């Protein structure tokens, strides 16, 4: 399995993501510049967190027009795995690969803390190593993480079991339906605001993010 971690101007979680795959999971992972136009040979592409292009206009709005984006879209269409974390989730919504949008937190403040998530759908390539309805502790760090979508879109997400992660107990940003992460209908594109790559070693405070990476590895072996 070969993984691409896309680096945009302003990305700051690309190293964390690389280390989670390379050091912890021993996967074959490479950094890929936003300037590239091909992702040939890769099985998974990751859009990491950060502040691509300084979050000007809207979060992810400029990154969405980078050279690499058509290749990401092609991977999604081919059924390959696409993961967007934090700013990566915002980019996926700007691309239209995932419905809805991420707006400013209800508090209008940047929130950096560990939150409790409930695994709503463990039947995806990203979550098959979690238990159904499992509660996990994952860090968040964002100012624009409040998930919004029209009621008909929210209803469709719920009916299709596309809500993958949901905030439990405290909703830190005002996301509708307490949504922390969603996938597309096909299940091969996941966007989430929390940072699983920051929860893969005990020395960092916990390993509740590790099953996500193990799930991806398992999906790659079975493909």
Curated annotation (Swiss-Prot):
Domain of life, per lineage: Bacteria
Primary localization class, coarse: cytoplasm
GO molecular function: ATP binding; glutaminase activity; phosphoribosylformylglycinamidine synthase activity
InterPro entries: Class_I_gatase-like, PRibForGlyAmidine_synth_PurQ
An individual GO BP term: 'de novo' IMP biosynthetic process
Pathway named in the protein's UniProt entry: Purine metabolism; IMP biosynthesis via de novo pathway; 5-amino-1-(5-phospho-D-ribosyl)imidazole from N(2)-formyl-N(1)-(5-phospho-D-ribosyl)glycinamide: step 1/2
EC number of the protein: 6.3.5.3, 3.5.1.2
Recorded GO CC terms: cytoplasm
Catalytic activity: N(2)-formyl-N(1)-(5-phospho-beta-D-ribosyl)glycinamide + L-glutamine + ATP + H2O = 2-formamido-N(1)-(5-O-phospho-beta-D-ribosyl)acetamidine + L-glutamate + ADP + phosphate + H(+); L-glutamine + H2O = L-glutamate + NH4(+)
Keywords: ATP-binding, Cytoplasm, Glutamine amidotransferase, Hydrolase, Ligase, Nucleotide-binding, Purine biosynthesis
Active site per database record: 86, 195, 197
Domain Glutamine amidotransferase type-1: 2-223
Location relative to the cell: Cytoplasm
One Pfam family named in its UniProt record: GATase_5
The keyword Cytoplasm is annotated on this UniProt entry: yes
Annotated function: Part of the phosphoribosylformylglycinamidine synthase complex involved in the purines biosynthetic pathway. Catalyzes the ATP-dependent conversion of formylglycinamide ribonucleotide (FGAR) and glutamine to yield formylglycinamidine ribonucleotide (FGAM) and glutamate. The FGAM synthase complex is composed of three subunits. PurQ produces an ammonia molecule by converting glutamine to glutamate. PurL transfers the ammonia molecule to FGAR to form FGAM in an ATP-dependent manner.
UniProt xrefs under NCBIfam families: FGAM_synth_I, PRK03619.1
PANTHER family: PHOSPHORIBOSYLFORMYLGLYCINAMIDINE SYNTHASE SUBUNIT PURQ
Complex and partners: Part of the FGAM synthase complex composed of 1 PurL, 1 PurQ and 2 PurS subunits.
HAMAP family the record matches: PurQ (MF_00421)
Record's protein name: Phosphoribosylformylglycinamidine synthase subunit PurQ
């Amino acid at each position: 399995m070969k993984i691409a971690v896309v680096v945009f101007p302003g990305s700051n979680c690309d190293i964390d993501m690389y280390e989670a795959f390379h050091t912890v999971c021993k996967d074959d992972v490479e950094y890929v510049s936003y300037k590239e136009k091909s992702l040939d040979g890769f099985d998974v592409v990751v859009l990491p967190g950060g502040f691509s292009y300084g979050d000007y206009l809207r979060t992810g709005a400029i990154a969405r027009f980078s050279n690499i984006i058509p290749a990401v879209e092609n991977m999604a269409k081919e059924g390959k795995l696409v993961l967007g974390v934090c700013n990566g989730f915002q980019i996926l919504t700007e691309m239209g690969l995932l419905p809805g949008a991420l707006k400013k937190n209800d508090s209008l403040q940047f929130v950096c803390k560990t939150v409790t998530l409930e695994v709503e759908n463990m039947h995806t390539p990203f979550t098959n190593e979690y238990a159904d309805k499992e509660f996990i502790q994952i860090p968040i760090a964002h100012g624009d993480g409040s998930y919004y979508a029209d009621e008909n879109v929210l209803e469709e997400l719920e009916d299709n079991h596309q809500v993958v992660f949901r905030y439990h107990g405290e909703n830190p940003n005002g996301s509708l339906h307490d949504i922390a992460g969603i996938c597309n209908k096909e299940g091969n594109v996941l966007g989430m605001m929390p940072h699983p790559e920051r929860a893969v070693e005990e020395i960092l405070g916990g390993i509740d993010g590790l099953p996500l990476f193990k799930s991806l590895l398992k999906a790659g072996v079975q493909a």
